[in-house]
A protein has these predicted regions:
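Terminal substrate-recognition subdomain of acyl/acetyltransferases
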Residues: 113, 117, 122-131
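Conserved beta-strand-loop-alpha-helix junction that forms the acyl-donor binding cleft
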Residues: 72, 97-108, 125-130
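Acetyl-CoA-dependent GNAT
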Residues: 1-58, 63, 68, 81-82, ...
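Conserved acetyl-CoA-binding loop-helix of GNAT-fold acetyltransferases
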Residues: 67, 73-86, 109-114
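Short, structured secondary-structure boundary patches
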Residues: 73-76, 103, 118-121
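Short glycine-rich loop/turn motifs that provide flexible caps or phosphate-binding loops at active sites
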Residues: 44, 59, 74-76, 99
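Conserved GNAT acetyl-CoA-binding A-motif
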Residues: 81, 88-100
Length: 131
């Protein structure tokens, strides 16, 4: 099972560090990253959160959660999501959300265990087509 909200389901260790270095420049708003490292200091998981105020109160998006395949099922994702929820509470976030595919059952369980609820929102996607 893959527990992640990411376009990068199988990042190599060196790619994780490079990916994390680009996070602060990706979205406008305040970017917060929690990382979990193993005993030798390699990143084994991370959670990227974007905080922003669209004029109706501070909102928080869990933009990406990643746990390396060999560390999945060991509580790393739960620890990261607990930190995300703690940050939302500390910062008095009025709305927190995360996006995932419905068929990513492990991610859905992870997010629900952290207190997120399925709001049945329909998201429509547009992709350019060749003309």
């Amino acid at each position: 099972e893959q527990v992640h909200y990411s376009d990068h389901p199988q990042l190599r260790r060196e790619e994780i560090e490079d990916h994390l270095a680009t996070v602060p420049t990706t979205f406008r708003g305040e970017n917060v990253v929690f990382a979990v490292r193993d005993e030798i200091g390699a990143v084994i998981g991370f959670c990227w959160i974007v905080l922003f105020d669209p004029g109706t109160g501070l909102e928080g998006e869990v933009a990406e959660v990643y746990v390396s395949p060999e560390h999945r099922g060991r509580g790393v994702g739960e620890m990261l999501m607990q930190q995300a929820v703690r940050l939302f509470r500390e910062r008095r976030v009025t709305l927190g959300y995360v996006w995932t595919r419905p068929d990513n059952e492990a991610a859905v369980r992870l997010y629900q265990s952290a207190g997120f609820e399925n709001n049945r929102q329909l998201v429509l996607t547009w992709y350019p087509t060749e003309q």
